[in-house]
Design a protein with these regions (language model features):
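N-terminal Rossmann-like FAD-binding beta1-loop-alpha1 element of flavoenzymes
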Residues: 5-32, 336
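Conserved Rossmann-like nucleotide-cofactor binding loop
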Residues: 15, 38, 187
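Conserved flavin/dinucleotide-binding core of flavoenzymes
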Residues: 240-344
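Mid-domain catalytic core of redox enzymes
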Residues: 162, 167-270
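Active-site/ligand-binding neighborhood in enzyme catalytic cores
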Residues: 84-166, 174-177, 183
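Glycine-rich FAD pyrophosphate-binding loop
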Residues: 24-48
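Dinucleotide-binding Rossmann-like beta1-alpha1 core, especially the glycine-rich loop
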Residues: 48-107
Length: 344
């Protein structure tokens, strides 16, 4: 039995890492238990044949307070997407302002914007008005690694099986602490904490293709009004380090299950090019891309489920990096107020 920490955090996603950073800064000992081999949760990438491949379309918005306060974006060579009044272009007929923005928001929420709470839509609108999202060198994993780097006690490749009172039981050991924070995906969270409801998750698939035949202007985000692909961009035009060979690397997103040949046909239509010779690089089907946030759901759900047991993540906030990080911060602040009441 290990019991030398004040708080156990299950999951090293952005919410759990944020909570751990706050707690460690307050002098509260914390152990983070992560089932995978790296930090960041969904904020991760792979490197294949010199290409940086984010899992999903991963961009960082410098207007998000927690991202901004981390101070990491400038250190990681943050580069914004194309600037200007219209940083994206619409593929398809535009008759009304709704035709202009709803396809873009569909790519943000990975769902029909009409299914998303108006409160959440306003939060996202404000974030885009305040800052231009972009990429960092090394891909999404570079941010996650840097964000986790100051933390002193993270256990990777360790799966949590259950929580019994103040004890966390894993496939390696048992840990005991006065307080526990569950910072996992919502499906795992409901398996560990029966008191919370299941959250519906939106799925998506990200496709990567490369070409040596340059497509001019492809660094400007293409948003598709009607079609199986909802967006596409030459991600290496935004961040050259995403392709060490110099070939253009295209990232495209779909919400439906389609074949790779269908993706090529859509890419040909979007970019007005013969894509038959484009190299297929990778495909990432992400079944838990973002939590749905329907009308009536509060912007933030309570993070303390019962005394000493907290659940955090963007499914307890709103679907964004800021929502995840803020939920982790809320849990940490409540714990800090309990442990150090004079600091509240």
């Amino acid at each position: 039995m290990k019991s030398d920490s004040d708080v156990i955090i299950i999951g090293a996603g952005l919410a759990g890492l944020t909570a751990a950073r706050y707690l460690q800064s307050a002098g509260i000992s914390t152990v983070v238990i992560e089932g995978s081999d790296r930090p960041g949760g969904r904020v991760k990438c792979d490197t294949i044949d010199g290409f940086t491949l984010d899992h999903g379309f991963q961009v960082f918005n410098p207007s998000y307070p927690h991202l901004k306060n981390s101070g990491l974006l400038p250190q990681l060579g943050f580069t914004p997407m194309v600037t200007g009044l219209m940083p994206f272009r619409i593929v398809g007929e535009v008759r009304t302002p709704r035709d202009l923005f709803e396809p873009f928001l569909k790519g943000v929420f990975l769902s029909d914007p009409k299914n998303v709470s108006p409160v959440v839509r306003r939060e996202i609108y404000k974030s885009f008005l305040k800052g231009r999202p972009g990429l960092v060198d090394g891909g999404a994993s570079a941010f996650s690694r840097a964000y986790a780097e100051p933390l002193m006690d993270i256990h990777y490749n360790e799966t949590v099986h259950r929580i019994e009172g103040n004890t966390v039981i894993t496939d390696h050991a048992q840990y005991s602490a006065e307080m526990i924070i569950v910072s996992t995906d919502p499906v795992t969270a409901t398996q560990l904490v029966s008191e919370i409801d299941v959250v519906m998750m939106n799925s998506s698939t990200t496709w990567y293709h490369a070409t040596a035949d340059r497509v001019e202007g492809a660094g400007r985000f293409a948003v598709v009004k009607d079609g199986p692909l909802i967006n596409s961009v030459a991600i290496s035009d935004v961040k050259k380090s995403y392709s060490t060979s110099g070939d253009q690397l295209f990232s495209s997103t779909t919400l439906s299950v389609i074949s790779e040949s269908e993706v090529r046909r859509e890419l040909s239509r979007i970019w007005n090019r013969d894509t038959s010779r484009w190299e297929f690089v990778a495909q990432y089907e992400i079944k838990q891309s973002l939590p749905s946030h329907p009308a009536g759901k509060p912007l933030y759900s309570p993070v303390e489920i019962k005394p000493g047991l907290f659940v955090v993540g963007d499914h307890r906030g709103y679907p964004s990096q800021q929502g995840a990080m803020q939920s982790g911060a809320l849990a940490a602040k409540q714990i800090i107020e309990r442990v150090h009441p004079t600091r509240s």
